[in-house]
Amino acid sequence: VEEAGLDDPWELYEKGEWTWSTFMEMARKFSDPENGKYVLDGYNPEDSFVCTTGTPLVSLEGGKLVSHMNDANIEKCIDMLRSFDNTQEQLRYPRDTENSWTPSYNEWADGNTLFFEDGSWRYEETWRKFKKKNKWEDDEVNFVPFPQMDGADKYYQSMKQDSIMLVAGAKNIDGYKAWIYSNLVASNDPEIAKAGREQSKEEYDWSDTLLDRLDTMKDPKTFSGVFDFKNGIGQDIATKDNQDNPVEQLTKGPYMTGESYTSFRATYQGQIDARLAELNKTVE
């Protein structure tokens, strides 16, 4: 970031200036396809970007699945993402042509990709190893939330919910209750949190700065959460494992091909709406 003459994204975030327009300005300044420089890599950045509009493609409202494929902000967001393709402004790492559709950790580590979309586990599994190998300073690896939509009333981010399910017919109900309770106690115990923080620093090379930022981003009060149910309407038309399915094509299609969102929507909307109607009918 510093070598490219760019502002620190985290500092922009803290000042309330980390927005789509700021991000796009940075993207165009950094990207240089002729010299292998790109702004973004990762498996599904388009999904997280859509959630910054505050509206998911498919929401759950009053117990029913609701489509928002015609939402103007979603269309605006995906049109922005369309510009990343190599048929447009060439802002994303061309993993489809350069790396067999796989994101490149090495290109990021070599400073050729500015942002890499992934979870915090990627630091422990991959980035810290580059840090050790290359003897980087602590501030060589950082992260930032997805930018806020310009003019948004709140700062929205994609969120998900992890659940511990009780299987029908389970025999050890008391054990299930004890597991739930122990998780609840552990999550609210400051001594356990402190011990976990020290373990993260000692075993996984986290710094206090990164852990502080991670705590900020994980705090439910920091952002307004957006839950997208688009991948829960059937493996045949909605799964991240196959980008050619109808639901994934709505977001990944424009990002990876440069074709318009409206063209993908026209192709798949009827099929998706029919599935939502089918699922909603089962709970009437």
Each language-model region and where it sits:
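Extracytoplasmic/periplasmic substrate-recognition and gating elements
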Residues: 131-202
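Conserved C-terminal helix/tail region of periplasmic/extracytoplasmic solute-binding proteins
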Residues: 168-177, 185-284
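Extracytoplasmic/periplasmic solute-binding protein
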Residues: 2, 16-67
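Glycine-centered hinge/linker elements that transmit conformational signals in sensory
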Residues: 24-29, 62-99
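Aromatic-glycine-rich donor-binding/catalytic loop that engages nucleotide-sugar donors
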Residues: 1-13
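Short, solvent-exposed loop/beta-turn-alpha elements that line the ligand-binding surface or hinge
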Residues: 12-15, 57-76, 133, 149-155
